[in-house]
Amino acid sequence: MTEPEVNPKAYPLADAQLTKTLLDLVQQAANYKQLRKGANEATKTLNRGIAEFIVMAADAEPLEIILHLPLLCEDKNVPYVFVRSKQALGRACGVSRPVIACAVTIKEGSQLKPQIQSLQQSIERLLV
């Protein structure tokens, strides 16, 4: 069984190890109320300047519905990354539906800060 072909526009795509780490952090962020689910809410966090980083699903159909986010991220200097599955992203966000984009938000005194910073660096390495 081969993995389905991923749209080349979904760049940078996280590998299996980074995806697992990302989804774990997304799950923790949901518990700490530091998560915004959905493309529209992710856009709002970017515009308000409260996004730590953005995670998008590479299998969003059509992909163009989330491709405004990387442009906005680059304007705001926010790291962004794609994971393969919207189903997995939805589960990590703690909802029963697929999620095509989510934003981990800034929170003062958050216990997730060290993990968030190390993931931001990993994502930025992908973008180079």
Swiss-Prot record:
The keyword Nucleus applies. Coiled coil: none annotated. Pfam families: Ribosomal_L7Ae (PF01248). Signal peptide: none annotated. Residues 96-128 are annotated as: Important for U4 snRNA-binding. One of its GO terms (molecular function) is U4atac snRNA binding. GO terms for biological process: mRNA splicing, via spliceosome; ribosomal small subunit biogenesis. Residues 36-48 are annotated as: Interaction with U4 snRNA and U4atac snRNA. The record marks 61, 86 as: Interaction with U4 snRNA and U4atac snRNA. Keywords: mRNA processing, mRNA splicing, Nucleus, Ribonucleoprotein, RNA-binding, Spliceosome. Its main location: nucleus. One of its GO terms (cellular component) is small-subunit processome. It comes from the Eukaryota. Part of the small subunit (SSU) processome, first precursor of the small eukaryotic ribosomal subunit. During the assembly of the SSU processome in the nucleolus, many ribosome biogenesis factors, an RNA chaperone and ribosomal proteins associate with the nascent pre-rRNA and work in concert to generate RNA folding, modifications, rearrangements and cleavage as well as targeted degradation of pre-ribosomal RNA by the RNA exosome. Involved in pre-mRNA splicing as component of the spliceosome. Binds to the 5'-stem-loop of U4 snRNA and thereby contributes to spliceosome assembly. Identified in the spliceosome B complex. Component of the U4/U6-U5 tri-snRNP complex. Part of the small subunit (SSU) processome, composed of more than 70 proteins and the RNA chaperone small nucleolar RNA (snoRNA) U3. Belongs to the eukaryotic ribosomal protein eL8 family. This is NHP2-like protein 1. The lineage of its organism: Eukaryota, Metazoa, Chordata, Craniata, Vertebrata. The gene is snu13.
